[in-house]
Curated annotation (Swiss-Prot):
Belongs to the IPP transferase family. It catalyses: adenosine(37) in tRNA + dimethylallyl diphosphate = N(6)-dimethylallyladenosine(37) in tRNA + diphosphate. Keywords: ATP-binding, Magnesium, Nucleotide-binding, Transferase, tRNA processing. It comes from Lactiplantibacillus plantarum (strain ATCC BAA-793 / NCIMB 8826 / WCFS1). GO terms for molecular function: ATP binding; tRNA dimethylallyltransferase activity. HAMAP family: IPP_trans. Substrate binds at residues 16-21. Its cofactor is Mg(2+). NCBIfam families: miaA. Coiled coil: none annotated. This is tRNA dimethylallyltransferase. Its EC number is 2.5.1.75. The keyword Nucleotide-binding applies. The gene is miaA.
Length: 311
């Protein structure tokens, strides 16, 4: 029997403005780690302020990956994230270091952990198909998805527990999008990770205050000028032009709203995004929650949890 090497991977997740970057730097130093960005916008060159990108001089000598790898007119898909991150995990682990993935793009992180497979003609997952099964299972129970898989790929159904809805839906989606049996493709990724996920959180009022303050700091640092440059390059027509902190400026540049209205909209969109992030991590992923902003004394408990996981 072939023994599959399980790579240790630490994920630091959570909503925007909750303190992920500071914790990731501390843990990377402590655990001899390298950091992989799990943020869908930090891949873009020249967009530094609005993405809260950690700059080279702030990285404290810790290698950072998946930052500044795309031009603003290039798409960055979840399939590419999974592929690139998988390769990085293998490389970092082979060099005796710990891969630490930091970010708030929940779907990217979930896809990595669940080991979603993306065929060559299927560069993006079928979100509607996937969500339809999750919705149906919420009403009829997870067995309904497993029974469907049993009909379409009995061997896969035998290998997957009916209660493991994410994996069952993943198998159904693979059959649906590729026309091939899930049981016949080599799952070379999802089951080879020994992942531990810390999810930072905070009381909502405090989090929203921090978000508003962060937006003000970004504006003071030159966010408007960064957004104006993006607007002049094509704005909303570009993949990068859809990001929060950027597209809200475009109506102002077009003379359709005031500057203050644009800033207020960025704050509103950022707060709503943080709420969606928390909901995603709560409902879609298995995480250990921790509130360091209000309870810094819990930092020691993180070390204890990690020591147990790494042993």
């Amino acid at each position: 029997m072939t023994t599959v090497t399980k790579h240790k991977v630490l994920l630091i997740a959570g909503p925007t403005a909750v303190g992920k970057t500071a914790l990731s730097l501390a843990l990377a130093k402590q655990l001899n780690g390298e950091i992989i960005s799990g943020d869908s916008m930090q891949v873009y060159r020249h967009l530094d302020i609005g993405t809260a990108k950690i700059m080279p001089e702030e990285q404290a000598g810790i290698p950072h990956h998946l930052i500044d790898i795309k031009n603003i007119d290039q798409r960055f898909t979840v399939a590419e994230f999974v592929s690139r991150t998988t390769a990085l995990i293998i490389d970092i682990s082979a060099r005796g270091k710990l891969p630490i993935i930091v970010g708030g793009t929940g779907f990217y992180l979930q896809s990595l952990l669940a080991g979603y497979q993306f065929g060559p003609a299927d560069n993006e997952p079928d979100m509607a198909y996937r969500q339809a099964w999750f919705d149906r299972a919420a009403v009829e129970g997870s067995d309904v998805a497993w029974m469907a898989l049993k009909q379409r790929d009995p061997q896969a159904a035998t290998a997957i527990a009916p209660a493991n809805l994410v994996r069952v839906v993943r198998a159904l989606e693979y059959v649906h999008t590729t026309g091939q049996l899930f049981s016949e493709q080599a799952d070379t990724h999802g089951d080879t990770l020994d992942a531990y996920t810390l999810c930072l959180t905070a009381e909502r009022a405090l989090l929203y205050t921090r978000i508003n303050q962060r937006v003000d700091q970004m504006v003071a640092a030159g966010l408007e000028q960064e957004a104006r440059w993006l607007f002049d390059q094509g704005g909303a027509m570009l993949p990068a032009g859809k990001g929060i902190g950027y597209h809200e400026w475009f109506p102002y540049f077009n003379g359709e709203q005031t500057r203050d209205e644009s800033i207020a909209k960025i704050k509103q969109d950022s707060r709503r995004y943080a709420k969606r992030q928390l909901t995603w991590f709560r409902n879609k992923m298995s995480v250990d929650w921790i509130n360091l902003l209000e309870h810094p004394e819990l930092r020691a408990s993180i070390d204890q949890r990690l020591a147990s996981w790494l042993s």
